């Protein structure tokens, strides 16, 4: 799993636990965002070349970034499954607050950001209801990818044991 929160901070040499965004004014600039997505796809491409599967965790609010990811995957004969996590704003605020209390996450999201984040159309993505337990969400994704029968037994044994 590669995520933009971690890559963004690595690019600007900001500690993952540092959430003082005012101290790093360029962290969310357009230039840093472009560089972050470029680096995300470069890392993903190296993993694909090595025969690995890759999950890219990002907002994907820009259609150009999504198209660049599709093109990169196509160059390597890799399939792309676009999933959009959807969640009631109240649950999202609570989960972000809980995550921030626990620490250990690179994300700078705050509960108040939930209502301020613009919604961007992503018609190619399959919506995923993330209000349920993590196991139920994984089941929903696996069922969507492989059908109600689930994944092949060898993978099932390894990943769900």
Question: For each predicted feature, which ranges?
Answer:
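Small-molecule kinase domains that catalyze NTP-dependent phosphoryl transfer to phosphate-bearing small molecules
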Residues: 98-161
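Conserved substrate/cofactor phosphate-moiety recognition/catalytic segment
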Residues: 1-52
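Short, hinge-like loop/turn segments at secondary-structure boundaries
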Residues: 17-21, 73, 99-103
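Conserved P-loop NTPase nucleotide-binding/switch module
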Residues: 60-61, 69-78
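Loop/turn-to-beta-strand initiation segments
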Residues: 50-54, 79-81
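Conserved phosphate-donor/acceptor-positioning beta-strand/loop module used by diverse small-molecule
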Residues: 75-96, 128
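Conserved nucleotide-binding/hydrolysis micro-motifs of P-loop NTPases
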Residues: 6-9, 60-62, 86-93, 132-135
């Amino acid at each position: 799993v590669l995520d933009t929160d971690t890559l963004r901070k690595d690019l600007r040499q900001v500690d993952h636990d540092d959430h003082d965004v005012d101290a790093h004014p360029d962290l969310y600039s357009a230039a840093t965002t472009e560089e972050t997505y470029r680096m995300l796809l470069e890392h993903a491409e190296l993993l694909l070349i090595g025969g690995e599967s890759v999950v890219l965790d990002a907002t994907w609010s820009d259609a150009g970034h999504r198209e660049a990811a599709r093109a990169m995957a196509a160059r390597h004969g890799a399939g792309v499954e676009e999933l959009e996590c959807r969640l009631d704003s109240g649950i999202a605020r609570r989960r972000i607050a809980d995550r921030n209390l626990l620490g250990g996450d690179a994300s700078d999201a705050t509960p108040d950001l939930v209502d301020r984040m613009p919604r961007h159309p992503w018609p190619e993505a399959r919506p995923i209801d993330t209000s349920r337990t993590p196991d139920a969400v994984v089941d929903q994704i696996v069922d969507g990818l492989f059908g109600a029968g689930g994944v092949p037994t060898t993978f099932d044994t390894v990943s769900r044991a």
